Amino acid sequence: MQQLAGNLEGVAAAALNCGSNDNTFRTRGLSGHILGGSKVQRAHPQTGDEGGACPGLAGATVWAGQWDVGDCAPVPVAGPDGHVTRYGLEWLAKNSYEGQKQQVVHPRILWNAEIYQQAQVPSIDCQRFLQTDEGLKEFLQSFLLYGIAFVENVTPTKEHTEIVAKRISIIRETIYGRMWYFTSDFSRGDTAYTKLALDRHTDTTYFQEPCGIQVFHCLKHEGTGGRTLLVDGFHAAEQVRLQAPEHFELLAKVPLRHEYVEKVGGCHNHMIGVGPLLNVYPWNNELYLIRYNNYDRAVINTVPHPVVRRWYHAHRALTAELRRPRNELWVKLKPGKALFVDNWRVLHGREAFTGYRQLCGCYLTRDDVLSTARLLGLQA
């Protein structure tokens, strides 16, 4: 048993020690009041929406009292209007800064080609994917863990590919339309509309927020080559973090401009997106987005020249890791096999090809994919 009075964040930090062997509740210097400007919110009983910070609650206090640490009784917090809110110690621990630093937001399995192939991740049959929550959940679990997933036995048309894509998300309309459909006809000012090989890259880095998920479906190929290249960018970045943390840190700090200028036929676009190559959550340094595209990277003029030189050294280290053959997963896309790619994580490319090759696909809104996963009980 221990007496306690303090601010809400202090209580949350103290709750991390709930259930320790000596049965004590370490308060870590609690002050007795919620600090000025702290937000204590009340949720609507039906909608769950928080109505914003209640004015005047900067003076709310955590009652001094005794709690049995063994059963983790709720901690009461009294507002100046007399309203009392009770917080469970488990909830306080989970939502404290110290608690968040220890948690992974998105559990993942980082992979190279050998790791992925040995995992023998199954594809999902189209009908099971479309008609059952179990099939959908299995697909999303694979997608969240590995950043790629396949649906088999899809009717090879743009219309049926759209039905499959909309199973997990709203389609994100971009300058390429909703469902894009392309061959090597140079109809757009993009290297994808050629027969040339494409190096590994993130798509739409020139958007302020790159598209979250990309869908590919090869409808027809009468020729040779054209295999799809997939590389886990997070695995490569983690190798850089382990071998040269100063490179990782620099790539996560220096903002870059990516630019796309198109003047082909009736398509006139000038897109610019700005952001670091590696994006991390500031509280736990967890990587959540890689923005790697040497085709669309613009002039680096956002930092002093000495930093630019250091950045190129760091970029060279990451590029070397991304281009290691052991990190390259090559997949031959065929009619009936749709590929979903986490564009924030997995880089994709293509080998050169001959003959007539026809692909369709789209971009999906990331928020809706993650929402679908959470509604099925997955951590996303």
Region annotations inferred by a language model:
Residues S96-E98, V105-I148, N153-F340, W344-A380:
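Active-site environment of non-heme Fe oxygenases that use a 2-His-1-carboxylate facial triad
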Residues Q2-Q141:
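Fe(II)/2-oxoglutarate
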